[in-house]
Curated annotation (Swiss-Prot):
Pfam families: Tho1_MOS11_C (PF18592)
Main subcellular localisation: nucleus
PANTHER family from the UniProt entry: PROTEIN MODIFIER OF SNC1 11
GO molecular function: RNA binding
The protein, known as: Protein MODIFIER OF SNC1 11
Gene coding for it: MOS11
Phylogenetic classification of the source organism: Eukaryota, Viridiplantae, Streptophyta, Embryophyta, Tracheophyta
Function: Contributes to the transfer of mature mRNA from the nucleus to the cytosol. May function before mRNAs enter nuclear pore and in the same mRNA export pathway as MOS3.
Amino acid sequence: MATNGEKVTATVVNGGGLSTGENPKKIVDLNTTELDRTDDILDGEVKGFSDSGEKKEETDSNGIGSTAGVDSGDISPVDDIQKKIRRAERFGVSVKLTEEEKRNSRAERFGTVAAAVVNGSEGTKKAEELKRKARADRFGVPSATSTTDKTEEEAKKKARLARFGKETKVDSAEENKRKARALRFSKEASADASSDLPEKQIIGKEAAVSGSAA
């Protein structure tokens, strides 16, 4: 035991405990009320947390969270979509993307930019016109614009009216023919009926005479 007036010192070798070896690594004054911060190396239990990895993992997780929070604002929507897809593939979960996300991913995959996103409705109209022209060139059909469409529609209407107008005239002529035929056959039927009446009257008279004679 050390008295109050004595100064006790001890040597420590590599933090392995107290020893009285010839080659002391550090001399520690045990009479001081508080050890220096650099002497924490001597305490194996305190540094054991870092050796075991608990504190290290905690700090790493905090660092990852902070970097993720910083980078989240700078991440493009395409990268975010790709991350979602990779995460879903890793966990075996189906990915539900919105229409905008699907368009962005498709544009990123094919290396093109969607015309609707860049130029709005005008871009979509131009894209549709280009598609129509390309299709017309491929099939050998002249591309039809809005003006040509209107002229073609008017020409079709005129042709239809002309065609149906002729048919109405033909129908009226046919109707007149039918009326004339009906009149002719009605006259013939009436003439036949009138010619048959005298014979019927004669037959009736003969029957009456024979009946009275009997």
